[in-house]
Structures are given as structure tokens and as C-alpha cells.
Amino acid sequence: MTSILTNVAAMAALQTLRGIDSNMEETQARVSSGLRVGTASDNAAYWSIATTMRSDNMALSAVQDALGLGAAKVDTAYAGMENAVEVVKEIRAKLVAATEDGVDKAKIQEEIEQLKQQLTSIATAASFSGENWLQADITTPVTKSVVGSFVRDSSGVVSVKTIDYVLDGNSVLFDTVGDAGILDKIYNVSQASVTLPVNVNGTTTEYTVAAYAVDELIAAGATFDGDSANVTGYTVPAGGIDYNGNFVKVEGTWVRAIDVAATGQEVVYDDGTTKWGVDTTVAGAPAINVVAPASIENIDITNAAQAANLDALIRGVDEALEDLISATSALGSISMRIGMQEEFVSKLTDSIDSGIGRLVDADMNEESTRLKALQTQQQLAIQSLSIANTNSENILQLFRQ
């Protein structure tokens, strides 16, 4: 049936054209944005996941920047610590040279002073962005943290993980408040010892005796030659501490005798100018620890007390050197870990970007082909609508003469 009121063909052609135009708009939007899922209305699930992961990627980008800053701090501290190791090696070499008879200790001390000033310069200069890990107030250990990663667990809870480094007496060169740093603290060092037979109340027992600053006791083959004495009600000052009890005589000096069960160190002689100690343990025990004459910061071999105890001073420097090497190793390990973490975060960011792309990116080849097809369909729909609109004109021809 042909009607002049209702053009069914034109209505159908127009509906088709509207659908094609709608599809073209969507396709053109995907082509222009490059996204298959650009809004939540396109695909709510994929849009939600992609938006969350983009947010996480922004956080990871901030982590990568923080890692770069942390790496700079660690590398600065590492460079300073590595240089300090070499300087302390030089100081130890100077002290070894000072043990030779006839050397000018004053000249050697001048060289040591320059090396000590270099250590101070290293500790002061090893600062980055206001952070100095080589000198600090370590009254209580201070933890320095470098942002390491941003983590979202299975329940959606996010957290920031850090790489920590503790500043304490084994990791800083100088303590800015006290004397607990590697270079400004005095070390306990292992000292030579000899075994002496000691007669206490009629019972002879062998003791391992470590002597400090007394040549007669630390010399090889030193022996005990004397009698025991039971002193009651008499106080003998020993390094500022008073004792009551048994005493024995060593090289003309009365020293306190310790019961076999006791193992503590005892300072036993102080005449006002020379101070030394005797430690006793059961025979066969390792050498006893004694206090070095000075810290590295306070080395002065022109001082009579230090010059007389160079061996202990060298051992103290050696202990400090071991701590320096350990601290340098720790910083090197952290630097390596930060480098690995930077590489990992970079790869992780790329992987997340790739995953987001798989969810929401448009296939441009496919979209281009679809757009071309829709453009063709649009032209055909317009042609169909044009033909449908000519039907009314055909009806008019029936009434023309």
C-alpha cells in the first residue's frame, strides 16, 4: 500500500541512519581517545580496575623518585665512609711506624693530625639534601628510611615499604653529642696474657693474667714470684674502687687476689702517675679485653701514656677499622638493593601500564576498519533515505496530466 501520510520506507531508512550515526560517534571517540573503555558507562568493571591501577602507578612513580633521592643519600654516605676507611688505614700505618725505635713521634703526630682533620672534613661534607649519615646524635639509635615500594594487598589495603639504615655507634663516624661514634669512642681491645701460679690461702691455682701498661707482666715468660697475704680489715684503693680481702705481691706491688670462682676484671694499681690493671680468669681462657689508650679522634703519640702503649692503641684503631669496613659494606649493600628496587619499580610500572592497556585500550586497526565500514553504511543509508523520500513524488506523478 502506498500512502502519502506515512512513508514507511523513509522511516526505516532514517532509523538505520540514526543507528549508524550513533555507532560512528562511538567509533570516532575510541579512535580519537585511543580507549575502548573511556568511561564507566563503557564497561564499569574494567573502568574501575583501570582507574585503580592508574592511581597505583602514580604512587609507584613517586616511589621511583624517592628511590632516586634515597640512592643519592646512600651513595654520598658510602663515598664518605669508603674514603674514611682509607684514611684510618693511613693512621694505622703511621702508628706502626711510630713503634720503631728512634723515630720522631712528633713528626708522625703532625701527619696523624692532618689525617684526623681529613676524617672530620669527610664526616662534615658527606651530606645530601640536609641528611648526614656519618655524624649524628646517637644518644639513642636513629633509623633512616628510604621509600622502597608501594604495596596493595589482596584486601585492597595499601602500604609504603621502606629500606632502613640504623645510625648508631657502629655506623657513624662521630657522635655529635657524646663520644659513641666509631672515631670518637675508646675501644676495648684484646691484650696479651700470661699464666701465673697464685697461692691463695695455701692453695696454688694457675690464673691467666692479662696486664696492661706493665712491661714486667706482659713480657713473654713473665712469672709470679712471691707469697700470698691474707689482709683483713684493711682497704687497698684500686683504680678508685676499694677492696677488702686477699692480696698477693707481683713485682713488689700488692694486688688483689680473686677467688677461683670469680672471673671479673680488676684494676689493682694506681700510684697517681701510672695506672695499670690485672685481669684474672681460669687458665686456658682467651686473652682479656682492656681499654685502648685513646679514640682515633684523640690520638696523640707525643703523650707519654699513649706513646708507652702503642700496641694497644694500634689494636684500638684496628677495631675501629673493622667497624668502618662493616658500615661501608652495609651502605654498599643498601645501595645495591636500591638500584635493584629502582629497576624493579620501573619494570613493574611498565607491566601495570601494559595490563591497563589490555583492559581499556582500543585496537586502532580494528577501529579504523570499523569506522570505514560505518562511513560506507552511512552513505548507503543516506542514499536509501533519499530513495524513500522520492516515493511521494512518484505519487504526485499519478495526478499530473
Swiss-Prot record:
Family stated for the protein in its record: Belongs to the bacterial flagellin family.
Gene: flaD
Keyword Secreted: yes
InterPro entries listed in its UniProt record: Flagellin, Flagellin_C, Flagellin_N
Single annotated GO MF: structural molecule activity
Entry's Gene Ontology cellular component terms: bacterial-type flagellum; extracellular region
Protein's UniProt name: Flagellin D
Keyword Transit peptide part of the UniProt annotation: no
Major localisation: secreted
Alphabetic keyword roster: Bacterial flagellum, Secreted
Top-rank lineage group of the source organism: Bacteria
Record-linked PANTHER family: FLAGELLIN (PTHR42792:SF2)
Its biological purpose: Flagellin is the subunit protein which polymerizes to form the filaments of bacterial flagella.
Cell compartments where the protein resides: Secreted; Bacterial flagellum
Coiled-coil positions: none
